[in-house]
């Protein structure tokens, strides 16, 4: 699980302040999208990567993000209601690698910790200097962790 975001895990575990951060971000994001602002998705990108991340992306990436914003809005609209209890995660029987970026959003850092606590046979790995965009920013380190996990079941 790379930067997995079952947001409801925060809510069902009483991490209300962290859960509220997602609510604040999506309210702004959805409102700007509905108002027709082309760069509304910058709220999501900057939430995960830090202020200014969207603006720092190459134009080609920003254009892609803008083009795919309607699909991302649907993802956010449906994903925020995913609220399975801790017991659901305790049913996962396979060896699970949970990977997070060391510079990630505090809510994402906590979700990774909780997944590791709740899933039996889960291990947490933190990629130094990374955030939510690990496949793009740290592909070699991520591939190394995944290779180890697939080969040995651990990382």
Question: Where would I find each of the regions flagged by the language model?
Answer:
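Short helix-adjacent coil turns
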Residues: 25-40, 137
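Conserved serine/cysteine hydrolase catalytic core
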Residues: 61-117, 123-126
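Conserved alpha/beta-hydrolase catalytic His-Asp/Glu region
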Residues: 34-73
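Acidic/histidine-enriched, beta-strand-rich ligand/metal-binding domains
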Residues: 17-20, 41-50, 111, 115-118
């Amino acid at each position: 699980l790379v930067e997995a975001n079952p947001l409801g895990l925060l809510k069902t575990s009483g991490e209300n302040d962290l859960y509220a951060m997602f609510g604040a971000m999506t309210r702004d994001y959805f409102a700007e999208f509905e108002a027709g602002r082309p760069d509304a998705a910058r709220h999501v990108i900057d939430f995960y990567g830090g202020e200014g991340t969207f603006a720092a992306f190459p134009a080609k990436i920003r254009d892609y993000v803008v083009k795919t914003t309607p699909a991302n809005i649907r993802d956010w609209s449906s994903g925020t209601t995913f609220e399975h209890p801790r017991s659901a995660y305790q049913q996962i029987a396979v060896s699970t690698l949970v990977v997070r970026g060391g510079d990630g959003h505090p809510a994402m850092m906590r979700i990774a910790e909780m997944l590791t606590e709740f899933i039996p046979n889960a291990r947490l790995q933190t990629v130094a200097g990374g955030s939510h965009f690990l496949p793009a920013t740290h592909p070699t380190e991520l591939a190394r962790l995944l290779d180890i996990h697939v080969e040995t079941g651990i990382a």
